């Protein structure tokens, strides 16, 4: 059976499926299994894409928040570390010890700022204390101006290395402490450091170490004036003032030069109508000379068509025409309903495969016969 175009034949299952009838192909378990697997694969793929579209923005937002929080904590940690190193450097330089020989120089572990004096008591004998620059983070602050803080029982005052003479120049009290920062998270435990070298044997005490109280600093003079600030924005426009008095009349000016000739004036209006002339005298008319022939006029427009004439008498019948070409084949009809199952066929012939063969030549079959 072919389609309307006659190009490709239709199979019976396809025609039945187009008609809405079930075939034995639809009841095939393999087809059902493949169809179920296809539906499941499409469903899982769609759910996976939807989950990815929903989860990706959430993960991106969480990563951004964690990154922002880590940056804030790192900045806070750097500020706290810098403050600790500043305080340690200030405390190391702010303890003046008495002239006692009961302290020996340490070999390692202390960073000495190049601009601060060597504390008394940290040198052994006549040897000067050497400047030690380690790889500790405190070495990063050597370029900053050094400020030593003296420690005593009273209020804290700032001191410098020139306090040995009892005077204080260009020193000011420190400003008020800033607001406390947010509490940081406890850091991990550091690794255990290496054991230090054995210290030198101590000397017998000669005199008790008493802190020397530095004299109070005089009030600092007023600083120089700062640079003038930037010019402010222009103010709003003021209200309009009152009208002023009329000025005095000026003197007459000099006579001007002769002006240029003006343009031509407009054409005057027509004059009044004159008086009526006298009537001519009656006389016989005299024909004038004949004029030249005029030009040929244009062709006139086409006239309207006349009324149609009456029909003539019918002519003799003509000869019959030739047979026309055959028309195209019509479309195939709707296929019929499949017929009923045929009658069961007769029983098949017995098989020729024996069940077993005896040694004496007999052949036995499953139905008990022997040949």
Curated annotation (Swiss-Prot):
UniProt GO BP: collagen and cuticulin-based cuticle development
Composition bias type Basic and acidic residues, residue spans: 246-260, 340-349
Compartments reported by the entry: Membrane; Nucleus
Keywords: Disulfide bond, Membrane, Nucleus, Repeat, Transmembrane, Transmembrane helix
Xref: PANTHER family: COLLAGEN, CUTICLE COLLAGEN 71
Subunit structure: Collagen polypeptide chains are complexed within the cuticle by disulfide bonds and other types of covalent cross-links.
Family statement: Belongs to the cuticular collagen family.
Function of the molecule: Probable cuticular collagen-like protein. Nematode cuticles are composed largely of collagen-like proteins. The cuticle functions both as an exoskeleton and as a barrier to protect the worm from its environment. Acts downstream of the Wnt signaling pathway, perhaps in the formation of the adult cuticle.
Protein's recorded name: Cuticle collagen 71
